[in-house]
Amino acid sequence: MGARASVLSGGELDKWEKIRLRPGGKKQYKLKHIVWASRELERFAVNPGLLETSEGCRQILGQLQPSLQTGSEELRSLYNTIAVLYCVHQRIDVKDTKEALDKIEEEQNKSKKKAQQAAADTGNNSQVSQNYPIVQNLQGQMVHQAISPRTLNAWVKVVEEKAFSPEVIPMFSALSEGATPQDLNTMLNTVGGHQAAMQMLKETINEEAAEWDRLHPVHAGPIAPGQMREPRGSDIAGTTSTLQEQIGWMTHNPPIPVGEIYKRWIILGLNKIVRMYSPTSILDIRQGPKEPFRDYVDRFYKTLRAEQASQEVKNWMTETLLVQNANPDCKTILKALGPGATLEEMMTACQGVGGPGHKARVLAEAMSQVTNPATIMIQKGNFRNQRKTVKCFNCGKEGHIAKNCRAPRKKGCWKCGKEGHQMKDCTERQANFLGKIWPSHKGRPGNFLQSRPEPTAPPEESFRFGEETTTPSQKQEPIDKELYPLASLRSLFGSDPSSQ
Protein backbone atom coordinates (compact mmCIF):
# COMPACT_ATOMS: atom_id res chain seq x y z
CA MET A 1 0.00 0.00 0.00
CA GLY A 2 2.95 2.31 0.54
CA ALA A 3 3.73 2.53 -3.18
CA ARG A 4 0.12 3.31 -4.00
CA ALA A 5 -0.11 5.89 -1.21
CA SER A 6 2.85 7.82 -2.69
CA VAL A 7 0.72 9.00 -5.63
CA LEU A 8 -0.03 12.30 -3.83
CA SER A 9 2.21 14.44 -1.65
CA GLY A 10 1.16 15.92 1.68
CA GLY A 11 -0.48 19.09 0.37
CA GLU A 12 -2.10 17.31 -2.57
CA LEU A 13 -3.45 14.63 -0.24
CA ASP A 14 -5.11 17.31 1.90
CA LYS A 15 -6.82 18.75 -1.18
CA TRP A 16 -7.83 15.23 -2.25
CA GLU A 17 -9.56 14.50 1.05
CA LYS A 18 -11.57 17.75 0.87
CA ILE A 19 -13.26 16.88 -2.45
CA ARG A 20 -16.74 15.37 -2.10
CA LEU A 21 -17.94 12.30 -3.96
CA ARG A 22 -21.28 13.91 -4.86
CA PRO A 23 -22.47 17.51 -5.02
CA GLY A 24 -23.78 18.41 -1.58
CA GLY A 25 -22.91 14.99 -0.16
CA LYS A 26 -21.12 14.24 3.09
CA LYS A 27 -18.68 11.57 1.89
CA GLN A 28 -15.26 12.69 0.71
CA TYR A 29 -12.40 11.06 -1.17
CA LYS A 30 -9.97 9.03 0.95
CA LEU A 31 -6.67 7.30 0.43
CA LYS A 32 -8.51 4.01 -0.07
CA HIS A 33 -10.01 5.33 -3.32
CA ILE A 34 -6.51 5.72 -4.82
CA VAL A 35 -5.61 2.19 -3.69
CA TRP A 36 -8.79 0.84 -5.30
CA ALA A 37 -8.12 2.73 -8.56
CA SER A 38 -4.58 1.35 -8.83
CA ARG A 39 -5.84 -2.21 -8.31
CA GLU A 40 -8.49 -1.77 -10.98
CA LEU A 41 -5.86 -0.49 -13.43
CA GLU A 42 -3.80 -3.62 -12.79
CA ARG A 43 -6.87 -5.70 -13.66
CA PHE A 44 -7.13 -3.83 -16.97
CA ALA A 45 -3.41 -4.39 -17.66
CA VAL A 46 -2.64 -0.66 -17.26
CA ASN A 47 0.41 0.59 -15.38
CA PRO A 48 -0.73 2.06 -12.01
CA GLY A 49 2.38 4.27 -11.97
CA LEU A 50 0.66 6.57 -14.45
CA LEU A 51 -1.46 7.88 -11.57
CA GLU A 52 1.54 9.73 -10.14
CA THR A 53 1.54 12.43 -12.86
CA SER A 54 -1.09 14.53 -14.57
CA GLU A 55 0.09 13.38 -18.01
CA GLY A 56 -0.34 9.75 -16.98
CA CYS A 57 -3.85 10.46 -15.72
CA ARG A 58 -4.66 12.18 -19.05
CA GLN A 59 -3.53 9.09 -20.96
CA ILE A 60 -5.66 6.79 -18.81
CA LEU A 61 -8.68 9.06 -19.25
CA GLY A 62 -8.19 8.95 -23.00
CA GLN A 63 -8.24 5.15 -22.92
CA LEU A 64 -11.29 4.87 -20.65
CA GLN A 65 -13.49 7.59 -22.13
CA PRO A 66 -14.59 5.69 -25.30
CA SER A 67 -15.79 2.78 -23.12
CA LEU A 68 -18.01 4.82 -20.81
CA GLN A 69 -21.13 4.26 -22.91
CA THR A 70 -20.90 0.45 -22.80
CA GLY A 71 -18.88 0.06 -19.59
CA SER A 72 -20.08 -0.97 -16.16
CA GLU A 73 -20.55 1.16 -13.05
CA GLU A 74 -17.07 0.14 -11.84
CA LEU A 75 -15.53 1.52 -15.04
CA ARG A 76 -17.42 4.80 -14.62
CA SER A 77 -16.31 5.05 -10.98
CA LEU A 78 -12.70 4.44 -12.05
CA TYR A 79 -12.96 7.20 -14.68
CA ASN A 80 -14.42 9.64 -12.13
CA THR A 81 -11.70 8.87 -9.58
CA ILE A 82 -8.89 9.42 -12.10
CA ALA A 83 -10.57 12.63 -13.31
CA VAL A 84 -10.53 14.07 -9.77
CA LEU A 85 -6.92 12.92 -9.34
CA TYR A 86 -5.98 14.70 -12.57
CA CYS A 87 -7.48 17.95 -11.26
CA VAL A 88 -5.49 17.61 -8.03
CA HIS A 89 -2.25 17.13 -10.01
CA GLN A 90 -3.07 20.15 -12.20
CA ARG A 91 -3.94 22.23 -9.09
CA ILE A 92 -7.45 22.84 -10.40
CA ASP A 93 -9.75 23.72 -7.50
CA VAL A 94 -12.84 21.51 -7.54
CA LYS A 95 -15.37 20.78 -4.81
CA ASP A 96 -16.84 17.49 -6.03
CA THR A 97 -16.64 14.87 -8.78
CA LYS A 98 -19.14 16.58 -11.10
CA GLU A 99 -17.15 19.79 -11.06
CA ALA A 100 -13.97 17.85 -11.94
CA LEU A 101 -15.71 16.18 -14.90
CA ASP A 102 -16.92 19.56 -16.14
CA LYS A 103 -13.38 20.98 -15.94
CA ILE A 104 -11.98 18.05 -17.95
CA GLU A 105 -14.72 18.35 -20.57
CA GLU A 106 -14.02 22.06 -20.88
CA GLU A 107 -10.30 21.38 -21.30
CA GLN A 108 -10.95 18.74 -23.97
CA ASN A 109 -13.18 21.11 -25.92
CA LYS A 110 -10.44 23.76 -25.88
CA SER A 111 -7.85 21.28 -27.14
CA LYS A 112 -10.17 20.19 -29.97
CA LYS A 113 -10.70 23.78 -31.04
CA LYS A 114 -6.96 24.38 -31.06
CA ALA A 115 -6.39 21.27 -33.18
CA GLN A 116 -9.06 22.33 -35.66
CA GLN A 117 -7.59 25.82 -35.85
CA ALA A 118 -4.12 24.43 -36.47
CA ALA A 119 -5.44 22.16 -39.21
CA ALA A 120 -7.20 25.10 -40.84
CA ASP A 121 -4.02 27.19 -40.71
CA THR A 122 -1.95 24.51 -42.42
CA GLY A 123 -4.63 23.90 -45.04
CA ASN A 124 -5.08 20.31 -43.97
CA ASN A 125 -8.81 19.79 -43.62
CA SER A 126 -8.63 16.02 -43.39
CA GLN A 127 -9.25 14.62 -39.95
CA VAL A 128 -6.88 11.69 -39.47
CA SER A 129 -7.56 9.09 -36.82
CA GLN A 130 -4.95 9.04 -34.07
CA ASN A 131 -6.39 6.09 -32.18
CA TYR A 132 -4.03 3.46 -30.87
CA PRO A 133 -2.79 1.05 -32.27
CA ILE A 134 -2.71 3.09 -35.51
CA VAL A 135 -0.24 5.92 -34.91
CA GLN A 136 1.58 8.43 -37.09
CA ASN A 137 5.34 8.06 -37.44
CA LEU A 138 7.89 10.83 -37.93
CA GLN A 139 7.42 10.76 -41.69
CA GLY A 140 3.69 11.40 -41.29
CA GLN A 141 2.70 7.90 -42.34
CA MET A 142 0.01 5.92 -40.50
CA VAL A 143 1.55 2.73 -39.12
CA HIS A 144 0.15 -0.07 -37.03
CA GLN A 145 1.51 -1.20 -33.68
CA ALA A 146 0.75 -4.81 -32.97
CA ILE A 147 -1.27 -5.64 -29.88
CA SER A 148 1.02 -6.28 -26.90
CA PRO A 149 1.46 -9.72 -25.30
CA ARG A 150 0.51 -8.15 -21.98
CA THR A 151 -2.90 -7.21 -23.34
CA LEU A 152 -3.39 -10.68 -24.78
CA ASN A 153 -2.39 -12.26 -21.48
CA ALA A 154 -4.90 -10.11 -19.59
CA TRP A 155 -7.67 -11.10 -22.03
CA VAL A 156 -6.88 -14.83 -21.80
CA LYS A 157 -6.76 -14.68 -18.00
CA VAL A 158 -10.17 -12.98 -17.87
CA VAL A 159 -11.73 -15.67 -20.06
CA GLU A 160 -10.14 -18.48 -18.02
CA GLU A 161 -11.18 -17.05 -14.65
CA LYS A 162 -14.60 -15.61 -15.50
CA ALA A 163 -15.57 -18.00 -18.33
CA PHE A 164 -18.20 -15.84 -20.06
CA SER A 165 -19.74 -13.95 -17.17
CA PRO A 166 -21.21 -10.48 -17.88
CA GLU A 167 -18.05 -8.57 -16.85
CA VAL A 168 -16.13 -10.13 -19.78
CA ILE A 169 -17.83 -7.78 -22.27
CA PRO A 170 -16.63 -4.43 -20.81
CA MET A 171 -13.19 -5.98 -20.28
CA PHE A 172 -13.01 -6.95 -23.97
CA SER A 173 -14.21 -3.49 -24.97
CA ALA A 174 -11.49 -1.81 -22.90
CA LEU A 175 -8.67 -4.05 -24.12
CA SER A 176 -9.66 -3.74 -27.80
CA GLU A 177 -9.98 0.04 -27.93
CA GLY A 178 -8.95 1.29 -31.39
CA ALA A 179 -7.96 -2.18 -32.58
CA THR A 180 -8.04 -3.29 -36.18
CA PRO A 181 -9.92 -6.40 -37.35
CA GLN A 182 -6.59 -8.24 -37.41
CA ASP A 183 -5.99 -7.36 -33.73
CA LEU A 184 -9.49 -8.50 -32.81
CA ASN A 185 -8.98 -11.83 -34.58
CA THR A 186 -5.70 -12.25 -32.68
CA MET A 187 -7.56 -11.79 -29.38
CA LEU A 188 -10.21 -14.34 -30.38
CA ASN A 189 -7.63 -16.87 -31.57
CA THR A 190 -5.81 -16.78 -28.21
CA VAL A 191 -8.84 -18.31 -26.47
CA GLY A 192 -7.94 -22.00 -26.19
CA GLY A 193 -10.99 -23.50 -24.52
CA HIS A 194 -14.69 -22.76 -24.86
CA GLN A 195 -14.74 -23.80 -28.51
CA ALA A 196 -18.52 -24.16 -28.46
CA ALA A 197 -18.79 -20.51 -27.48
CA MET A 198 -16.28 -19.55 -30.17
CA GLN A 199 -18.35 -21.39 -32.78
CA MET A 200 -21.45 -19.46 -31.67
CA LEU A 201 -19.45 -16.25 -32.01
CA LYS A 202 -18.39 -17.17 -35.57
CA GLU A 203 -21.99 -17.81 -36.56
CA THR A 204 -23.04 -14.41 -35.22
CA ILE A 205 -20.20 -12.71 -37.13
CA ASN A 206 -21.21 -14.46 -40.37
CA GLU A 207 -24.84 -13.37 -39.90
CA GLU A 208 -23.83 -9.75 -39.33
CA ALA A 209 -21.46 -9.84 -42.32
CA ALA A 210 -24.26 -11.11 -44.56
CA GLU A 211 -26.54 -8.34 -43.26
CA TRP A 212 -23.82 -5.78 -44.03
CA ASP A 213 -23.51 -7.03 -47.61
CA ARG A 214 -27.27 -6.82 -48.03
CA LEU A 215 -27.45 -3.23 -46.79
CA HIS A 216 -24.28 -2.07 -48.61
CA PRO A 217 -24.34 -3.47 -52.18
CA VAL A 218 -21.29 -3.04 -54.42
CA HIS A 219 -21.55 -0.08 -56.81
CA ALA A 220 -21.30 -0.99 -60.48
CA GLY A 221 -18.41 0.32 -62.54
CA PRO A 222 -14.70 0.62 -62.08
CA ILE A 223 -13.12 2.24 -59.04
CA ALA A 224 -11.81 5.78 -59.62
CA PRO A 225 -8.06 6.28 -59.42
CA GLY A 226 -6.90 7.09 -55.88
CA GLN A 227 -10.08 5.70 -54.36
CA MET A 228 -10.32 2.59 -52.18
CA ARG A 229 -12.81 -0.17 -52.74
CA GLU A 230 -15.71 -0.39 -50.35
CA PRO A 231 -15.28 -3.06 -47.66
CA ARG A 232 -17.45 -6.16 -47.74
CA GLY A 233 -18.60 -8.08 -44.69
CA SER A 234 -15.70 -10.51 -44.97
CA ASP A 235 -13.30 -7.55 -45.27
CA ILE A 236 -14.61 -6.11 -42.02
CA ALA A 237 -14.18 -9.51 -40.35
CA GLY A 238 -10.54 -9.52 -41.51
CA THR A 239 -10.73 -12.69 -43.60
CA THR A 240 -10.44 -11.16 -47.11
CA SER A 241 -8.66 -7.88 -46.33
CA THR A 242 -5.03 -7.07 -45.59
CA LEU A 243 -3.72 -4.99 -42.70
CA GLN A 244 -2.86 -2.10 -45.04
CA GLU A 245 -6.40 -2.05 -46.41
CA GLN A 246 -7.81 -2.01 -42.89
CA ILE A 247 -5.54 0.90 -41.93
CA GLY A 248 -6.52 2.70 -45.13
CA TRP A 249 -10.24 2.38 -44.43
CA MET A 250 -9.81 3.54 -40.84
CA THR A 251 -7.69 6.58 -41.81
CA HIS A 252 -9.49 7.48 -45.03
CA ASN A 253 -11.38 10.74 -45.42
CA PRO A 254 -14.18 10.13 -44.63
CA PRO A 255 -13.09 7.12 -42.54
CA ILE A 256 -14.78 3.72 -42.53
CA PRO A 257 -14.29 2.39 -38.96
CA VAL A 258 -14.00 -1.28 -39.85
CA GLY A 259 -12.43 -2.02 -36.47
CA GLU A 260 -15.33 -0.51 -34.52
CA ILE A 261 -17.88 -2.25 -36.76
CA TYR A 262 -16.21 -5.65 -36.29
CA LYS A 263 -15.91 -4.99 -32.56
CA ARG A 264 -19.64 -4.28 -32.41
CA TRP A 265 -20.36 -7.63 -34.09
CA ILE A 266 -18.14 -9.46 -31.61
CA ILE A 267 -19.84 -7.81 -28.62
CA LEU A 268 -23.21 -8.83 -30.06
CA GLY A 269 -22.01 -12.44 -30.20
CA LEU A 270 -20.53 -12.21 -26.69
CA ASN A 271 -23.92 -11.08 -25.40
CA LYS A 272 -25.48 -14.27 -26.76
CA ILE A 273 -22.74 -16.37 -25.17
CA VAL A 274 -23.17 -14.62 -21.82
CA ARG A 275 -26.89 -15.33 -21.95
CA MET A 276 -26.15 -19.02 -22.61
CA TYR A 277 -23.58 -19.24 -19.80
CA SER A 278 -25.95 -17.42 -17.41
CA PRO A 279 -29.24 -19.33 -17.79
CA THR A 280 -30.70 -17.88 -14.59
CA SER A 281 -33.43 -15.34 -15.24
CA ILE A 282 -33.66 -12.13 -13.26
CA LEU A 283 -37.15 -13.22 -12.21
CA ASP A 284 -35.64 -16.22 -10.37
CA ILE A 285 -33.28 -14.16 -8.20
CA ARG A 286 -34.85 -14.09 -4.74
CA GLN A 287 -33.35 -13.31 -1.37
CA GLY A 288 -33.06 -16.24 1.01
CA PRO A 289 -34.55 -16.01 4.51
CA LYS A 290 -31.09 -15.74 6.13
CA GLU A 291 -29.18 -14.24 3.17
CA PRO A 292 -27.64 -10.79 3.77
CA PHE A 293 -29.15 -8.06 1.63
CA ARG A 294 -25.72 -7.15 0.23
CA ASP A 295 -25.16 -10.66 -1.19
CA TYR A 296 -28.67 -10.63 -2.66
CA VAL A 297 -27.99 -7.29 -4.41
CA ASP A 298 -24.70 -8.65 -5.82
CA ARG A 299 -26.48 -11.69 -7.32
CA PHE A 300 -29.30 -9.49 -8.63
CA TYR A 301 -27.07 -7.04 -10.51
CA LYS A 302 -24.79 -9.79 -11.83
CA THR A 303 -27.79 -11.51 -13.40
CA LEU A 304 -29.17 -8.17 -14.60
CA ARG A 305 -25.99 -7.49 -16.57
CA ALA A 306 -26.57 -10.72 -18.52
CA GLU A 307 -30.13 -9.72 -19.44
CA GLN A 308 -30.53 -8.66 -23.07
CA ALA A 309 -32.74 -5.62 -22.56
CA SER A 310 -32.61 -1.88 -22.98
CA GLN A 311 -31.50 0.40 -20.18
CA GLU A 312 -35.09 1.56 -19.58
CA VAL A 313 -36.23 -2.03 -19.06
CA LYS A 314 -33.29 -2.72 -16.74
CA ASN A 315 -34.15 0.37 -14.69
CA TRP A 316 -37.73 -0.86 -14.36
CA MET A 317 -36.48 -4.31 -13.28
CA THR A 318 -34.27 -2.71 -10.66
CA GLU A 319 -37.03 -0.51 -9.23
CA THR A 320 -39.62 -3.31 -9.16
CA LEU A 321 -37.96 -6.70 -8.74
CA LEU A 322 -35.23 -5.69 -6.29
CA VAL A 323 -37.84 -4.89 -3.64
CA GLN A 324 -40.41 -7.46 -4.73
CA ASN A 325 -38.04 -10.46 -4.51
CA ALA A 326 -36.50 -9.51 -1.16
CA ASN A 327 -37.32 -11.57 1.93
CA PRO A 328 -40.20 -10.40 4.18
CA ASP A 329 -37.93 -8.64 6.71
CA CYS A 330 -36.08 -6.58 4.09
CA LYS A 331 -39.24 -6.01 2.06
CA THR A 332 -40.93 -4.35 5.05
CA ILE A 333 -37.96 -2.02 5.51
CA LEU A 334 -37.65 -1.20 1.80
CA LYS A 335 -41.34 -0.38 1.43
CA ALA A 336 -41.06 1.97 4.40
CA LEU A 337 -38.24 3.85 2.63
CA GLY A 338 -40.50 4.68 -0.31
CA PRO A 339 -40.03 4.37 -4.09
CA GLY A 340 -37.40 7.13 -4.35
CA ALA A 341 -34.78 5.47 -2.14
CA THR A 342 -31.27 5.04 -3.53
CA LEU A 343 -29.37 1.76 -3.46
CA GLU A 344 -27.05 3.12 -0.78
CA GLU A 345 -30.01 3.93 1.47
CA MET A 346 -31.47 0.46 0.89
CA MET A 347 -28.24 -1.32 1.79
CA THR A 348 -27.75 0.86 4.87
CA ALA A 349 -31.32 0.24 6.07
CA CYS A 350 -31.14 -3.54 5.53
CA GLN A 351 -27.70 -3.94 7.05
CA GLY A 352 -27.76 -6.64 9.72
CA VAL A 353 -31.23 -7.94 8.83
CA GLY A 354 -31.40 -11.68 9.49
CA GLY A 355 -28.61 -11.69 12.06
CA PRO A 356 -28.94 -12.45 15.79
CA GLY A 357 -29.14 -8.77 16.70
CA HIS A 358 -32.06 -8.19 14.34
CA LYS A 359 -33.88 -11.27 15.62
CA ALA A 360 -33.42 -10.09 19.22
CA ARG A 361 -34.89 -6.67 18.39
CA VAL A 362 -37.88 -8.21 16.61
CA LEU A 363 -38.50 -10.52 19.56
CA ALA A 364 -38.23 -7.63 22.02
CA GLU A 365 -40.75 -5.58 20.03
CA ALA A 366 -43.15 -8.51 19.89
CA MET A 367 -42.87 -9.11 23.63
CA SER A 368 -43.35 -5.43 24.45
CA GLN A 369 -46.69 -5.41 22.61
CA VAL A 370 -48.07 -8.16 24.85
CA THR A 371 -49.53 -6.48 27.96
CA ASN A 372 -51.73 -9.26 29.39
CA PRO A 373 -49.85 -11.32 32.05
CA ALA A 374 -52.07 -14.34 31.41
CA THR A 375 -51.06 -14.27 27.72
CA ILE A 376 -47.38 -14.24 28.66
CA MET A 377 -47.86 -17.29 30.90
CA ILE A 378 -49.66 -19.14 28.10
CA GLN A 379 -46.89 -18.31 25.62
CA LYS A 380 -44.26 -19.61 28.02
CA GLY A 381 -46.20 -22.83 28.43
CA ASN A 382 -45.43 -22.91 32.18
CA PHE A 383 -48.41 -23.31 34.49
CA ARG A 384 -46.55 -24.13 37.72
CA ASN A 385 -46.66 -20.53 38.90
CA GLN A 386 -50.44 -20.28 38.53
CA ARG A 387 -52.31 -20.50 41.88
CA LYS A 388 -55.19 -22.89 42.18
CA THR A 389 -58.49 -21.38 43.25
CA VAL A 390 -59.10 -22.18 46.93
CA LYS A 391 -62.41 -23.46 48.24
CA CYS A 392 -63.83 -23.14 51.70
CA PHE A 393 -64.75 -26.47 53.37
CA ASN A 394 -67.16 -24.66 55.70
CA CYS A 395 -69.48 -22.83 53.30
CA GLY A 396 -68.40 -24.41 50.00
CA LYS A 397 -67.62 -21.10 48.27
CA GLU A 398 -64.40 -20.26 46.40
CA GLY A 399 -62.01 -17.43 47.16
CA HIS A 400 -61.19 -18.08 50.82
CA ILE A 401 -60.34 -20.87 53.24
CA ALA A 402 -62.32 -22.15 56.21
CA LYS A 403 -60.11 -20.31 58.70
CA ASN A 404 -61.20 -16.95 57.23
CA CYS A 405 -64.83 -17.96 56.60
CA ARG A 406 -67.47 -15.56 57.99
CA ALA A 407 -70.34 -18.05 57.77
CA PRO A 408 -71.48 -19.98 60.87
CA ARG A 409 -69.16 -22.88 61.58
CA LYS A 410 -70.51 -26.18 60.31
CA LYS A 411 -70.78 -28.91 62.91
CA GLY A 412 -69.18 -32.28 62.49
CA CYS A 413 -66.68 -33.54 59.92
CA TRP A 414 -66.31 -31.40 56.78
CA LYS A 415 -65.75 -34.52 54.69
CA CYS A 416 -68.41 -37.02 55.66
CA GLY A 417 -70.75 -34.69 57.62
CA LYS A 418 -70.83 -36.92 60.72
CA GLU A 419 -70.27 -35.52 64.19
CA GLY A 420 -67.79 -36.72 66.75
CA HIS A 421 -64.54 -36.27 64.78
CA GLN A 422 -62.69 -33.78 62.57
CA MET A 423 -61.82 -34.07 58.89
CA LYS A 424 -58.20 -35.00 59.62
CA ASP A 425 -59.39 -37.99 61.68
CA CYS A 426 -62.06 -39.06 59.19
CA THR A 427 -61.88 -42.75 58.35
CA GLU A 428 -64.00 -42.50 55.22
CA ARG A 429 -61.97 -43.27 52.11
CA GLN A 430 -62.50 -42.11 48.56
CA ALA A 431 -64.09 -44.44 46.01
CA ASN A 432 -61.81 -46.24 43.57
CA PHE A 433 -62.17 -46.28 39.78
CA LEU A 434 -64.87 -48.97 40.08
CA GLY A 435 -67.01 -46.67 42.23
CA LYS A 436 -66.47 -48.75 45.43
CA ILE A 437 -64.76 -47.88 48.64
CA TRP A 438 -61.33 -49.53 48.81
CA PRO A 439 -60.05 -51.27 50.86
CA SER A 440 -63.38 -52.59 52.11
CA HIS A 441 -62.11 -54.95 54.87
CA LYS A 442 -64.73 -57.37 53.58
CA GLY A 443 -62.78 -59.91 51.61
CA ARG A 444 -61.10 -59.35 48.27
CA PRO A 445 -61.28 -56.01 46.44
CA GLY A 446 -63.84 -55.38 43.75
CA ASN A 447 -61.51 -56.05 40.85
CA PHE A 448 -60.95 -59.68 42.03
CA LEU A 449 -63.28 -62.63 41.47
CA GLN A 450 -65.58 -62.95 44.47
CA SER A 451 -66.06 -66.77 44.17
CA ARG A 452 -63.83 -69.57 42.99
CA PRO A 453 -64.94 -71.55 39.91
CA GLU A 454 -66.07 -75.10 40.66
CA PRO A 455 -64.20 -77.95 38.88
CA THR A 456 -66.14 -79.90 36.24
CA ALA A 457 -64.27 -83.22 36.78
CA PRO A 458 -65.63 -85.79 39.26
CA PRO A 459 -64.10 -85.70 42.75
CA GLU A 460 -61.05 -87.77 43.45
CA GLU A 461 -62.67 -89.82 46.27
CA SER A 462 -65.05 -91.51 43.78
CA PHE A 463 -62.04 -93.36 42.33
CA ARG A 464 -60.62 -94.50 45.65
CA PHE A 465 -61.59 -96.90 48.44
CA GLY A 466 -63.22 -95.76 51.65
CA GLU A 467 -60.13 -95.93 53.87
CA GLU A 468 -58.10 -93.68 51.58
CA THR A 469 -60.64 -90.97 50.86
CA THR A 470 -60.08 -88.95 54.00
CA THR A 471 -56.28 -88.75 53.74
CA PRO A 472 -55.87 -86.50 50.65
CA SER A 473 -58.49 -84.04 51.88
CA GLN A 474 -56.67 -83.70 55.18
CA LYS A 475 -53.37 -82.99 53.43
CA GLN A 476 -54.85 -80.44 51.00
CA GLU A 477 -55.40 -77.72 53.57
CA PRO A 478 -51.77 -77.28 54.68
CA ILE A 479 -50.64 -77.25 51.04
CA ASP A 480 -53.00 -74.36 50.26
CA LYS A 481 -51.88 -72.54 53.35
CA GLU A 482 -48.25 -72.98 52.39
CA LEU A 483 -48.83 -71.68 48.83
CA TYR A 484 -50.82 -68.61 49.95
CA PRO A 485 -49.57 -67.42 53.34
CA LEU A 486 -52.08 -65.25 55.17
CA ALA A 487 -49.52 -62.61 56.11
CA SER A 488 -48.73 -61.74 52.50
CA LEU A 489 -52.41 -61.60 51.54
CA ARG A 490 -53.20 -59.32 54.44
CA SER A 491 -50.40 -57.02 53.45
CA LEU A 492 -51.91 -56.67 49.98
CA PHE A 493 -55.66 -56.91 50.33
CA GLY A 494 -56.41 -56.72 54.05
CA SER A 495 -57.85 -60.23 54.61
CA ASP A 496 -58.24 -63.49 52.73
CA PRO A 497 -61.66 -65.09 52.36
CA SER A 498 -60.04 -68.51 52.70
CA SER A 499 -59.24 -67.73 56.33
CA GLN A 500 -62.82 -66.79 57.17
UniProtKB/Swiss-Prot annotation:
Residues 8-43 are annotated as: Interaction with host CALM1. Changing N206A: Loss of binding to NUP153 and CPSF6. SUPFAM superfamilies: Retroviral matrix proteins (SSF47836), Retrovirus capsid dimerization domain-like (SSF47353), Retrovirus capsid protein, N-terminal core domain (SSF47943), Retrovirus zinc finger-like domains (SSF57756). Residues 12-19 are annotated as: Interaction with host AP3D1. Keywords: AIDS, Capsid protein, Host cell membrane, Host cytoplasm, Host endosome, Host membrane, Host nucleus, Host-virus interaction, Lipoprotein, Membrane, Metal-binding, Methylation, Myristate, Phosphoprotein, Repeat, RNA-binding, Viral budding, Viral budding via the host ESCRT complexes, Viral nucleoprotein, Viral release from host cell, Virion, Zinc, Zinc-finger. Residues 73-77 are annotated as: Interaction with membrane phosphatidylinositol 4,5-bisphosphate. Disulfide bonds: none annotated. The record marks Y132, P133, L363, A364, M377, I378, N432, F433, F448, L449 as: Cleavage. Changing N206D: Loss of binding to CPSF6. Does not affect binding to NUP153. Retains infectivity to non-dividing cells. This is Gag polyprotein. It comes from Human immunodeficiency virus type 1 group M subtype B (isolate NY5). The lineage of its organism: Viruses, Riboviria, Pararnavirae, Artverviricota, Revtraviricetes.
